[in-house]
Amino acid sequence: RWECYRLNKYSSFEKIKNRLESKIDRDEYQTLSVELGDLKALLNTESNTHFINLINQLILLIESIILNKKYSKTNESLGKLIEAIKITTPTFSLDNYKNFAYSSMELRILMDIALLDNKIKFTEKSLEIMEFCIKTVDPNEELYPKICYNLSYTYHRLDMDKNALKYSNLGIEYCTKHRNYNGLNLLYFRKGIAEYLLGYKTYMDSLEKCIHFCEILSQYKLRDMVITNCKKLYDIDIC
């Protein structure tokens, strides 16, 4: 009976986590307070230290996302992420991060740290952390294509288009292999832009697939943004 109770609670945690990731994939940040409230309610019924740590890390991740996306408080957002990793790795810092082994949750947070560092000052540190994440993550984990996408974008910002293409392709391969279509639209967008900048004729096929998967996933706002940005930034007419 106790094991069944614990499995049910972990299942509830996973459902909240999956809802969160789904909202992030769709750029739906306005209602993250729902997941935040559900996690805090779950926390009040928990006594297992490991599980409490997991919940608190996810709470801090959500708080970080809200600070960044809703209030544009990037430094405070970064502070929340560092605090989250320190729950399980108390001596963690951006200078010694390579010294530790990380859980999937911690790698997810570390990836967001790299993204925020990229946004705040765009140094080589953000690329270095993202490369560490891709080398560390299990290539069969759901986190893998997210890191591929973000690494592709980071390389794009550095005008390293062949690397941007490489990691968008790796992310697409994962999604195809595991039949996980969330994020395929974004990966095909990165692939298409990299191909365009490299002078490859296949870029339009990739961008059309991006639009196709936006529609399959009912992400019409993202579809329209892709079409607008392609025209505005690259003079590419998709539709």
Q: What role is predicted for each listed range?
A:
Residues 26, 70-71, 120, 151, ...:
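Structural motif corresponding to the intra-repeat A-B loop/turn of tetratricopeptide repeats
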Residues 55-58, 101, 108, 146, ...:
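Residue register of alpha-helical TPR repeats
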Residues 23, 67-68, 110, 117, ...:
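Residue at a conserved register position within TPR or TPR-like alpha-solenoid repeats
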Residues 24-44, 71-92, 118-131, 159-169, ...:
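Helix-turn-helix repeat elements of alpha-solenoid scaffolds
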Residues 1-76, 80:
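Flexible inter-repeat linkers and adjacent short helices
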Residues 41-54, 70, 85-103, 133-141, ...:
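Flexible helix-coil transition and linker loops at the boundaries of alpha-helical arrays
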Residues 165, 169-239:
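Long, low-complexity regulatory tails in eukaryotic proteins
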